[in-house]
Amino acid sequence: MADRPVAGDTLRQPLGAVLRDAGLISEQQLVQALDAAAAWDVPLGQAVLALGFVSPQALYGALARHLHLPFIDVLKTPPDTRLFKAEHLDFYQAAEAIPIRREGTRLVLATPDPLMAARVIAERRALGLAAPEDDFSFAITARLDVLWTLQRQFETVLQHRARLTLDERQPEFSARSGLTPAQGMVFGVIAMAVLIGVMAAPGLTAVVVNTVLGLFFLAFLILRGVSIPVGLAAQALRQRDHDLPEDQDLPVYTILVPLYQEAEVLPLLARALRRLDYPRAKLDIKLILEADDRDTIAMAKQLGLETYVELVLVPPSQPRTKPKACNYALQFARGDYVVIFDAEDQPEPQQLKKAVAMFARAGPEIACLQAPL
């Protein structure tokens, strides 16, 4: 989504001029958007959306005119569901593109960013991965329409992936099957030893059990003692605000917020998210709601949330837990980094920037940071 040509295109009017001439933004807003796009290092269209100057439908309609491509509102013109293929789901997600119809032998793909979609197709073909056939063309549609279409079309597959992918790929890290045979044997031996000890020498057994428990709690005390100087050093590190990255160097950051029957705290959460000091066009915020949680969904729609905040509706299935909800939404994450907030969290405004800076300073073995909320 930018003032960049796609393959084979001729010169065209800049996107900003299309928006201005159509009366969608003023000259002053265009200047603001151009400044923001330069400061954030994002395409103009993303800056216009993030600043709230136009609606997604208006922007993508203008983008279609800018690129001389048809615009499709998938809510009014639903795609031909017979064209969807389960083996292409990874492509649809990576390219943010969905099949709409056939025009003769040509497959029409709807996407908010045809340049990215074309690049993903080329990359997947080079790697021998599933991708659309050679004869295809692009149409423009809103990004959220693509995501909602995929969620409706592949509900069962997405649920399965959220619930069972870890168990299928790395069962040793999954709790779905409970204790492994080895773990069960260890706990069984311990239980049997304690039982025999109680029967044969209750006094000695009590001493041994108390000693083991004492050592266990002593280890926690030592850990807390070591954490104090480490925490003080980390606090000093957090205060080095001058080391924070510039806005143009920041990556896209995904924020997952799982919610269930928490409509009353949504306004506070929305204010906390708005206070974040991070380029709006580089935020990928997902409010994760259960599809049957009508009160929370209604409140979220009433709040007039920004375009970088998406509602992800998780179809009802067991287990109904926030980890499963996060797994479901993670399939649509766009960020290089991911953070999980709870509904009541009030993160400090510069928390995301500080996390990016700390990851940059840390080694590759650091995959997760804990932050105050």
Where are these regions (language model features)?
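N-terminal membrane-anchoring/stem segments of glycan-assembly enzymes
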Residues: L158-D247
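Short, surface-exposed amphipathic charged segments that create phosphate/polyanion-binding patches used
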Residues: H88-D90, L150-L158, K324-Q331
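Extended, hydrophilic extramembrane loops/domains of integral membrane proteins
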Residues: R124-L164
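Internal catalytic domains of large membrane-associated glycosyltransferases
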Residues: A236-L373
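Active-site cores of enzymes that catalyze phosphoryl transfer or operate on phosphate-rich substrates
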Residues: V48, L109, G225-L232, V314, ...
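Short flexible coil/turn linkers enriched for glycine and charged/polar residues
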Residues: Q13, A39-V42, F91-A94, R102-T105, ...
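An alpha-helical, amphipathic repeat domain used for nucleic-acid recognition
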Residues: M1-V42, L49-I72
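Polyanionic, low-complexity intrinsically disordered segments
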Residues: Q46-A131
